[in-house]
Amino acid sequence: MDTTNDLQKNLISWRRHLHRHPELSFEEKNTSLFIQEWLRERDIPFTSGWAGHGIVASVIIDKDDPKFYAFRADMDAFPIQEENPREYCSQTPGIMHACGHDVHTTCLLGAIELILNNKDQLKSNLKFIFQPGEEKLPGGASIMLKEGAIDADNCKGTFGLHVQPSMEPGTVGCHRAIYMA
């Protein structure tokens, strides 16, 4: 990735692809395959199949240190018909990304891209969690943890995000504790 413009174009492309092809909770097969291919193209090691279609990718800078920070994005969509005239409207009848999970996944891909471009500045190992089934109970996160997708004892912190329509575009809000969970 050479420029901010390249990243912006890619973010738009990835998000529109994901938005066009939404999948319901625990049915995120093609979304998972899209992410896996993206990771392979960048030689990022990952494991998949967590809670069905979940993925955990890793950027390891110290193989002797089991500690890491985790970044998480959800992948599932809602059983809602999208009525949107945009060219990137859902192509799957009765299913749409109405909660922004296409954006969340895109943001995590973009973060990984930026991290790879600045890997020499990293001071900790990182894990990237693509979670299926966020909109159902029990959710994909609890299933992934039960299955051992990450070693919670070695996780120094987990970061997630959620789009917030009430905030001005281009701004970021932070909360010190659990938020929107």
Model-derived features: where do they sit?
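Acidic/histidine-rich alpha-helical segments that form the ligand environment
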Residues: 102-104, 108
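Short, well-ordered amphipathic alpha-helices
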Residues: 111-112, 145
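Acidic/His- and Gly-rich active-site-bordering loop/insert found
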Residues: 1-97, 106, 113-122
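Membrane-embedded alpha-helical core segments of multi-pass
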Residues: 108-111, 137
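Histidine/acidic-residue-rich, glycine-tolerant segments that coordinate divalent metal ions
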Residues: 78, 85-96, 103, 120-181
